[in-house]
Amino acid sequence: MGLVIVVIMFFVICFFINRNTDKELAERKKEEKNNYKKQGLYLVDDYYVKLYTGFREYGIKENVRLILFKDRIIFEIDYKVKKTILFKDIEDYRIQTESQLIERASLMKVACFGVLGLGMKGKEKEVNREYVYIKAVYEGEVANIIFERGIGENEKIIQELHRLIKEYKNMDISNNVITE
């Protein structure tokens, strides 16, 4: 009987701790939204992703925060470095499988090395894991950014990004100031 009471108490305590944590998280999110609003930025959503490529000084990075705004994307790396890409600088965005990315790399080999590029070995296996691919101009150079969040989540990010970019393009830019 005493064990049952201890187990029930444990679950009650866990329930209240979880409830308080959710409230604190919501309050922090609201406060962050207000702080960005003061800077003229309108936070829409954020995700934690695994970044594979896109920025020269970084290799594969876990727990990169992808922050979506109404006019830009910010990649927050190591909780301090922020890489900002304005929607006007995004040339292409889509979900691609690993096979499609490998094919794209093979085409780059041909472009760089001509016919000799065809002889270079690459991965031969067929893999259909999905990634988010964004081609954008970052600091004057074309950046091919590849990241993933997980099955189903990649599509959610692309849909949200598509909606935001569409709204951005339909916006009357002459009445809005877009900050860098």
In which residue ranges do the predicted regions lie?
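Glycine-centered tight beta-turn/hairpin loop motif at sheet-sheet or coil-to-beta transitions
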Residues: 61, 78-80, 137-142
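Short, surface-exposed charged micro-motifs
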Residues: 63-65, 82, 92
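Acidic, Ser/Thr- and proline-rich intrinsically disordered linker/docking segments
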Residues: 93-180
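Phosphoinositide-dependent membrane-docking surfaces
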Residues: 73, 84-101
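Beta-strand residues in well-ordered beta-sheet regions across diverse protein folds
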Residues: 69, 76-77, 135, 146
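Anionic N-terminal interaction surfaces
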Residues: 2-72
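Short, solvent-exposed coil/turn segments at beta-strand boundaries
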Residues: 65-74, 88, 139-140
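Short, surface-exposed coil-to-beta transition loops
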Residues: 61-63, 80, 127-132
